[in-house]
């Protein structure tokens, strides 16, 4: 057991030595080079992640990233406590992870990760783990917030880009938020289609290349403009790629700026030279919209990027086994050094300011 845990931690250390971390690097943690990983049980993997967190916090401070760190007792939950002698701040082994400030044990978190991997609805998660609906909601968004910056795969070759529109949503309980103001009139039933067009809809950018690499993010209210497109795709599109896009005029200066060839299609079913189209990106986008509308019964616009990163991860790991996907998500969320406290939820946003 100790050898398998040590091998797993060594593989994470090997990946961490790189300047940039790609999703494919995380996949390699479960690749053929780590043969003992196939024998890891649930308990061993939990111990491996705890040992890795402990080892990381003993090295550097998660706040100032300096190495002058000493042990400083234990928390009420018997977690090792540390003090940084440079910035004077205190932290424990779970600082800047989804488990930060959690009073539940790692076993219950591990079970929740299993439910996240299956995209289980919040109420079912709460019922199976005997936790409140509010806790299940917060855990989901803490995990999705952690994995979002880890999905950095670039796209190359022929890249399809489509935009799908969904109504702006203010779903949620706002009774305790005294500062909440809805910036539009309430949506009534049986409205005409023309009343939903324009700024009341939010665009989702869906990108996919022929190597199955994907990227998706919230665009803007209405159509996405050039500046927002460049902000989202500047570091995602490889130079000299071929862009197959919708009839949005913002892609013309984008292709010129990124030194890419552009095929701007007038219809979603148009095909140029029998190979340039956006049907794969369109299918990816329709899958996202259908899941949001019919499985989750709508998603608040402010949390939309969290769910898009979830779809991104599901699409990128669809060919991997269930156990491999579970370990990928656990590894990414622990390594990302991201935190989302309950008091931070009110500041979450997906649309540009």
For the regions a protein language model found, what residue spans apply to each?
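Residue-level recognition of single "structural anchor" positions
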Residues: 1-353
């Amino acid at each position: 057991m100790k050898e398998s845990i040590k091998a797993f931690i060594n593989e994470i250390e090997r990946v961490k030595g790189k300047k940039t971390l790609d999703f494919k690097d995380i996949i390699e943690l479960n690749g053929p080079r780590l043969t003992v990983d196939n024998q890891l049980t649930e308990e061993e993997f939990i111990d491996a992640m705890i040992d890795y967190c402990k080892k990381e916090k003993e090295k550097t401070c998660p706040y100032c990233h300096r190495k002058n760190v000493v042990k400083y007792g234990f928390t009420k939950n018997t977690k090792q406590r540390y003090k940084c002698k440079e910035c004077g701040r205190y932290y424990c082994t779970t600082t800047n992870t989804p488990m930060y400030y959690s009073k539940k044990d790692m076993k219950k978190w591990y079970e929740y990760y299993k439910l996240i991997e299956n995209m289980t609805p919040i109420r079912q998660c709460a019922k199976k783990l005997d936790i409140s609906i509010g806790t299940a909601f917060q855990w989901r968004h803490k995990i999705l917030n952690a994995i979002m910056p880890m999905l950095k795969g670039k796209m190359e070759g022929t890249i399809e880009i489509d935009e799908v529109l969904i109504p702006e949503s203010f779903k949620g309980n706002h009774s305790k938020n005294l500062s909440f103001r809805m910036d539009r009139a309430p949506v009534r039933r049986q409205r005409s289609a023309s009343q939903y067009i324009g700024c009341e809809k939010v665009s989702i950018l869906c990108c996919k290349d022929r190597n199955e690499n994907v990227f998706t993010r919230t665009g803007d209210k209405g159509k996405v403009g050039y500046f927002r497109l460049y902000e989202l795709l500047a570091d995602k599109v490889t130079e000299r790629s071929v862009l197959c896009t919708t009839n949005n005029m913002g892609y013309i200066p984008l292709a010129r700026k990124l030194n890419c060839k552009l095929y701007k299609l007038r219809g979603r079913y148009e095909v140029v030279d029998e190979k340039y189209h956006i049907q794969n990106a369109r299918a990816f986008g329709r899958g996202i919209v259908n899941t949001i509308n019919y499985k989750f019964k709508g998603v608040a616009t402010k949390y939309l990027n969290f769910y898009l990163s979830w779809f991104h991860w599901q699409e990128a790991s669809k060919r991997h086994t269930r156990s491999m996907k579970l370990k990928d998500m656990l590894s990414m969320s622990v390594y990302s050094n991201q935190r989302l406290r309950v008091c931070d939820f009110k500041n979450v946003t997906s649309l540009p300011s």
